[in-house]
Structures are given as C-alpha cells and as structure tokens.
C-alpha cells in the first residue's frame, strides 16, 4: 500500500504544478477549481495509504465543518436528480476526531446511498448532539436490502451483485469503532424503500485520543 501511494504521489505532484499554471491564465475558472479539489482529495487518499498500519491522531475538530465540506464535494459530483437534505446545528461541534478519516467514512456511506438510488432519490443527513455523544444519521430512498445482507455488510470483502461495498464499509467500521471508539450500524432498511445508517461518536476525549 505504501509503495502504491508513492507511485500515485509522483504524477499527482505534477498535476498540481500544471493546475497552478492553468490557474494563472484562468483565475476564475470553476472547472479548474473543482479539479484542484479532486487532486487535493487524491492527495489525502495517498497520504492515508502511506500511513497504513499507523494509529491516526485524533485532534479537537469541528464535525459540522467536516460534514459540510464532504457533502459539498459530493453534491457537485452527483446527479441533479439526487436531492440532498442536510440538517446541522448552527454551531461548531468540537470533538476528538481525525477529520480526513471521518470525511472518508461519511463519503463512503453517502456514495453507497447514491449508488442504491441509481441516480434519482433523496439523501438525508442529520447531525444530533446528545448528552455524551454525537449521532449522525444518513438515509437514502434507494433499493434497501435484506436483513441477512444488512448483518454482513461490515465484514471485509462482503459484496452483492447489485451493490459492491468491497472493503469500504469494513474500513468505515474500523475507523469509527477502533480508532474513534464509536459505533456504526444499519439503523433501518426496507426493500424498495431505502436504508438508514447510524454513526455514534464520543463527545469527550478518551484514552489515547492524542496518540
């Protein structure tokens, strides 16, 4: 994984240089701005791969901002027939987390919902602050899944013919449960109606949160 990250990193560095040159000639080009965001995201991915095996650092971060940035990025790259409904508190929610890993987890859950809706439907995300934890609910109006499938989707390599989760959700579980000491689950799923995922994160710092 680390070697792959190194190989990807070299052309990415070159792409950053070319984008910088193009921006000097087209300073207000929206496509260039979005391409730059894509490259930045690829850089984050290669950075994660280069640190495989290491324990990620958790720092006090604003979860609200992480969610806004993640949703904004995905919304611009989704079908216009996917309606996003985002409910967030009008304040910062500061908790110990790794912003990049939480963003990746949310992106994975949202993408699964978008895939399940096949280009048309509603994607709802709600952030709720409770006494000792933060709850994130992500719901879609997609195809839903059978109970036996819902019980297996967090296992490494599990997939179906219609939805290819691969390692995505198993890594999401590791990020939430092992690294952030939280919980992730399928809260509800109904065939033909949709699925709701629940993520719970601790509000207070826990042991080794700065390691």
Annotated model-derived regions:
Residues 30-81:
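Conserved DHp (HisKA) dimerization/phosphotransfer helix of two-component histidine kinases, i.e.
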Residues 120-132:
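Short beta-strand/loop element within the Bergerat-fold HATPase_c
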Residues 140:
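Acidic ATP/Mg2+-coordinating residue in the GHKL
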Residues 145-157:
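Short conserved segment of the HATPase_c
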Residues 176-177:
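Detector for a conserved hydrophobic position within an alpha-helical segment of the HATPase_c
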Residues 180-188:
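Glycine-rich ATP-binding loops of the HATPase_c
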